[in-house]
């Protein structure tokens, strides 16, 4: 059988993958793809066979795939025998946890993987190989579409274990169905970490049963628009929050897509909504008026870390989050925490002297130290690793140890390198260009947001995560993450427009080896995503697709 190279195993100095005339369009680009002659044609019934696995979790992957595939295509699945079934999921223990091999010929589809995640990602690739993106989008396939797969061999594995996206719902609230759409798109691009920014000065979005005022008061503010410059608060009652059952529903939804959810409660800074809910023990100046913030920027109204009740509050919040979100990481923020009110508070002044420091930033470190010690006392299945924004590095991190993770955003390359040198793990989330809430073009039609339109799809794609990182530090780099802040973004359609297709570019940086990446090649493959976005019913940057 004559083979045609779709993507060659290239060295770092070589050109982009060579595309055949009949090349398929896959994002993220796999390690190797070889097109063969022939096609696999689906009939009305598909016999399947699955190797046994603890908990039947590979069968669970296939069952979830079957629900969508049958609903969108009408193809019925039947249990067959290994070796004879048309779709076979076979264990291959030599592969890495998220790796897979996918082979399609005229008679069979064979998938090999070592873990359920690998089978899931192979099935995502399979859906991209279909002649229509309808199945991937969960929509019915048109009667005029002949359901086939090209004969192909794919060998694939991700570059990074952390391939993330953060959405800020503290500033604006979008609701369960919109979050599920985000998770669907992430899954299509093999992203596996949803960082859920749930608290801010402008809103608290997660139910904490021990502190009901967090959502009774903290989830609501007196303006939908956030004030900035000439833009003033509009006086409209605005807000919303997720009950714990809502959050658990989303956790289950994400799990089916092999996405882990990382909750973030940003404390002790970015906490005016919490302070407004419980000023008696969270405020540095409880005698003053406190309300959920109506403005953009950073509020000076931070949590009083010298109040034992405030420390207990934080511990209680972590306890409830642990029972909602099973993933082994919790993000506690740590960025942009003004120390002005601490400097004016006698208890904070006293605590600073007691810990033997003159740097008020160390009060924040001391606060985190107490929370970390609290978590360490929990049963093993309830312990969590802590993630912080890289401003934490401005203090003396020695009390925290090096078993924390630094999410590097401002001066990201240098901050990540500094964290790695301190023996900490790090995640690259550079403000420029991975803050994809920023304008993605200079067109007059661009929605109002931060930036000057220079964070284009091309700029996002061309960021090189491990550039100039010494080899002995690279094992500290967990992966990459795009972030989306919502000060200016009031509706889900604008989130989608700014997010897409830039999220696909970040996904490819997280999955595809650097020596295979090329923007012209990516842009060519990106054209197929127009159908996916339209079928999915999501907004996107149409100007990118027109710039072929």
Q: For each predicted feature, which ranges?
A:
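Soluble non-cytosolic domains of exported or imported proteins
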Residues: 55-60, 116-121, 173-177, 241-245, ...
């Amino acid at each position: 059988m004559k083979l045609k190279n779709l993507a060659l195993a290239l060295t770092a100095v070589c050109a982009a993958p060579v595309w055949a005339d009949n090349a398929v369009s896959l994002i993220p680009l796999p390690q190797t793809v070889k097109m063969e002659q022939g096609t696999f044609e689906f009939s009305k019934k598909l016999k399947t066979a699955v190797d046994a696995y603890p908990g039947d979790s590979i069968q669970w992957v296939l069952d979830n795939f079957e629900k969508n595939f049958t609903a969108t295509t009408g193809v019925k699945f039947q249990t067959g025998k290994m070796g004879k079934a048309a779709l076979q999921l076979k264990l291959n223990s030599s592969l890495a946890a998220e790796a897979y091999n996918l082979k399609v010929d005229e008679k069979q589809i064979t998938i090999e993987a070592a873990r359920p995640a690998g089978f899931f990602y192979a099935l995502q690739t399979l859906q991209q190989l279909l002649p229509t993106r309808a199945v991937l989008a969960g929509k019915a396939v048109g009667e005029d579409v002949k359901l086939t797969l090209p004969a192909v061999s794919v060998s694939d594995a991700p570059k990074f274990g952390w391939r993330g996206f953060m959405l800020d719902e503290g500033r604006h609230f979008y609701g369960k169905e919109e979050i599920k759409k985000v998770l669907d798109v992430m899954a299509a691009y093999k992203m596996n970490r949803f960082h859920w920014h749930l608290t801010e000065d402008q809103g608290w979005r997660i139910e904490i049963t021990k502190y009901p005022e967090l959502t009774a008061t903290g989830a609501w503010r007196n303006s939908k628009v956030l004030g900035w410059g000439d833009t003033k608060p509009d006086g409209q009652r605005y807000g919303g929050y997720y009950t714990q059952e809502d959050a658990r529903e989303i956790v289950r939804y994400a799990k089916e897509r092999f996405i882990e959810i990382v909750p973030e409660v940003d404390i002790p800074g970015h906490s005016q909504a919490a302070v407004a809910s419980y000023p008696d023990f969270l405020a540095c100046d409880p005698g003053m008026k406190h309300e959920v913030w109506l403005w953009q920027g950073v509020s000076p109204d931070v949590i009083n870390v010298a109040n034992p009740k405030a420390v207990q509050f934080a511990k209680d919040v972590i306890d409830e989050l642990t029972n909602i979100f099973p993933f082994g990481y919790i993000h506690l923020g740590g960025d942009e925490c003004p120390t002005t009110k601490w400097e004016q508070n006698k208890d904070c002044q006293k605590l600073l002297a007691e810990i033997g420091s003159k740097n008020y930033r160390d009060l924040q470190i001391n606060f985190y130290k107490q929370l970390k010690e609290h978590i360490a006392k929990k049963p093993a299945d309830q312990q969590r690793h802590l993630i912080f924004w890289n401003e934490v590095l401005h203090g003396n991190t020695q009390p925290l140890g090096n078993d924390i993770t630094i999410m590097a955003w401002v001066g990201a390359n240098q901050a990540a390198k500094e964290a790695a040198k301190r023996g900490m793990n790090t995640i690259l989330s550079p403000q420029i260009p991975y803050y994809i809430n920023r304008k993605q073009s200079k067109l007059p039609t661009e929605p109002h947001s931060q930036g000057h339109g220079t964070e284009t799809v091309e700029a996002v794609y061309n960021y090189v995560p491990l550039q100039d990182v010494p080899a002995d530090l690279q094992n500290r780099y967990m992966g990459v993450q795009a972030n989306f802040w919502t000060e200016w973004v009031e509706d889900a359609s604008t989130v989608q427009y700014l997010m897409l297709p830039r999220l696909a570019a970040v996904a490819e940086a997280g999955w595809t080896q650097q020596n295979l990446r090329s923007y012209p090649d990516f842009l060519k493959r990106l054209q197929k995503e127009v159908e996916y976005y339209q079928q999915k019913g999501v907004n996107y940057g149409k100007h990118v697709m027109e710039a072929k």
